[in-house]
Amino acid sequence: MTRAVAALGGEEESLRAHVARWFFESVEGASPQDTWATRETLDDGLETIKTLVRDWIVASGHDGVALVSLDYAERLGRLRSLEGREAIALLGKLDEAQRLARTNVSPALVGELVRMALPTMSP
């Protein structure tokens, strides 16, 4: 039983790392070739992205603020500032993606919608 839980935990961490890599590549202006979005990974992947976006907003212009994604704090700190209307609009688009994920819209399309919603490093 312990091994099964550990294996699941490792699989979850692997998905989180994969989604985070995809997120940072997208924000840095790349168009990632691999995708994380499958029917099985969609909910967890979207939650990972929302957490990274929330941390990005919090880290924008606020030194010493505690982030949820401590392991990505340095990379988040290097991103351009994300504030105000842009931040609100992005959170709204992520909510819309989560709503679409509960429908019969393909996971790949939901992932692509999220990628297009993410602002890139240039203002």
Where are these regions (language model features)?
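AAA+ P-loop NTPase domains with strong preference for DNA replication initiators
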Residues: 1-85, 89-123
